[in-house]
């Protein structure tokens, strides 16, 4: 049973909408996870880490990766260790700080990420295939309003 099925008609529309959004997110994420595993023998966290590094050609410190991915340093270290072993990322010393290093994509890692990112984009476009261009624009605008309200001073004070 998905999350949305837990809501009843007497629940507020906002709660039912929230559960529908969560359900849609989970369904799409499951499709992406399965696709990454089946087509590229990788995981979504590994894809996410490589995505962060693709945006930073000079690499990133581990603590910055952890912050951007919103996961613990231990998680980033474990994923990084796997990717280093596979030759997809490399660790580079940070000048002036013997305790730190930067992580960056290797040439092989960058090529692998580009292949994965192209397919990822295709999966996301496919997931929204039931909507026409106008509906996508409208949904994007409405979710933008939700996002803006969620960042309002009142929401942050709670």
What does each model-identified segment do?
Residues 28, 32-35, 69, 112, ...:
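Alpha-helical linker/hinge and terminal dimerization helices associated
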Residues 2-6, 81-141:
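Charged, amphipathic alpha-helical coiled-coil/dimerization segments
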Residues 18, 22, 26, 70, ...:
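Short amphipathic alpha-helical segments with heptad-repeat character
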Residues 26, 30-72, 86, 154-158:
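N-terminal helix-turn-helix DNA-binding core of bacterial DNA-binding proteins
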Residues 1-11, 133-158:
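C-terminal regulatory/oligomerization modules of transcriptional regulators
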Residues 1-40, 158:
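N-terminal leader segment of winged-helix/HTH proteins
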């Amino acid at each position: 049973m998905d999350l949305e099925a837990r809501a009843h008609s007497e629940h507020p529309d906002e709660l039912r909408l929230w559960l529908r959004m969560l359900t849609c997110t989970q369904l799409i994420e499951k499709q992406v996870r399965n696709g990454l595993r089946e087509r590229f023998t990788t995981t979504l966290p590994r894809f996410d880490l490589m995505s962060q590094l693709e945006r930073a050609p000079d690499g990133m410190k581990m603590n910055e990766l952890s912050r951007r991915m919103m996961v613990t340093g231990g998680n980033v270290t474990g994923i990084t260790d796997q990717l280093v072993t596979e030759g997809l990322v490399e660790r580079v010393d940070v000048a002036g700080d013997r305790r730190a290093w930067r992580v960056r994509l290797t040439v092989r890692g960058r090529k692998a990420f580009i292949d994965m990112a192209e397919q990822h984009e295709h999966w996301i476009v496919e997931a929204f295939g039931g909507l026409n261009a106008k509906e996508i624009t409208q949904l994007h605008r409405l979710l933008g309003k939700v996002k803006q309200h969620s960042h309002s001073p009142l929401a942050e004070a709670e």
